[in-house]
Amino acid sequence: MAAIRKKLVIVGDGACGKTCLLIVFSKDQFPDVYVPTVFENYVADIEVDGKQVELALWDTAGQEDYDRLRPLSYPDTDVILMCFSIDSPDSLENIPEKWTPEVRHFCPNVPIILVGNKRDLRSDPQTVRELAKMKQEPVKPEQGRAIAEQIGAFAYLECSAKTKDGIREVFEKATQAALQQKKKKKSKCMIL
């Protein structure tokens, strides 16, 4: 039986951990150096609810310089991973301010999984100290859940690509969301 194909697009601020999340899931290795993404594609196979799914993973650039290029990734998307970094409250603020309006414009009705990346840094003493200098603190789980509810996300999950904690759950949930979407999307327009 052929695998079901689904397209996943990942969005979020620059340096919030999008590429690491995709690489750890698809290649099971954590990249040592940060290189800003312009546009990358990966493919990974996952089994969810007894179904074999081939996930096309579309990485995007979060930097504002790419705001006009990024929409080229959106056509035929089945699920969106919308990411922020737990060590960057500003990146969470940009979820309802920037990312949700953009995604809802180009991908109306596509399920969104809100993902808090870099969960390991929530309790990292150096991260906590650095944020305290700016009168900030790491994002709390309830803050993430509140934003997920506000934007109508399918789910809210947290993970750490560095420790591999929660990675599989993110992609299982995203695949479930993409598979559920299929049932609703059957009616296509016909011109006679």
Curated annotation (Swiss-Prot):
Location in or out of the cell: Cell membrane; Cytoplasm; Cytoplasm, Cytoskeleton; Cytoplasm, Cell cortex
GO MF entry, a single one: GTP binding
Propeptide segment residues: 190-192
Residues that bear Cysteine methyl ester: C189
Membrane topology, from the record: Lipid-anchor
Pfam family, one: Ras
InterPro entries tied to this protein: P-loop_NTPase, Small_GTP-bd, Small_GTPase, Small_GTPase_Rho
Motif window: Effector region: 34-42
Major localization listed first in the record, in broad terms: membrane
Entry keyword set: Cell cycle, Cell division, Cell membrane, Cytoplasm, Cytoskeleton, Developmental protein, GTP-binding, Lipoprotein, Membrane, Methylation, Mitosis, Nucleotide-binding, Prenylation
Lipid-anchored residues (S-geranylgeranyl cysteine): C189
Outcome of gene disruption: RNAi-mediated knockdown predominantly results in embryonic arrest with surviving embryos developing elongation-defective uncoordinated kinky larvae. Defective ventral migration of P cells leading to defective gonad development. Defective establishment of anterior-posterior cell polarity in one-cell embryos. Abolished cortical contractility in early embryos.
Tissues where the protein occurs: In larvae and adults, enriched at the tip of the head where the anterior sensory organ is located and in the pharyngeal nerve ring (at protein level). In embryos, enriched at the boundaries of dorsal cells undergoing intercalation, ventral enclosure and elongation.
SUPFAM superfamilies according to UniProt: P-loop containing nucleoside triphosphate hydrolases
Function recorded in the entry: Required for ventral migration of epidermal cells during ventral enclosure in the embryo and for cell elongation. Also required for ventral migration of P cells during larval development. Involved in asymmetric spindle positioning during anaphase and establishment of cell polarity during embryo development. In adults, involved in regulation of multiple processes including locomotion, pharyngeal pumping, fecundity, ovulation, defecation and body morphology. In body wall muscles, regulates organization of myosin thick filaments downstream of unc-89.
Subunit structure: May interact with unc-89 (via DN and PH domains). Interacts with bli-3 and memo-1.
Similarity comment: family membership: Belongs to the small GTPase superfamily. Rho family.
Identification of the protein by name: Ras-like GTP-binding protein rhoA
Gene: rho-1
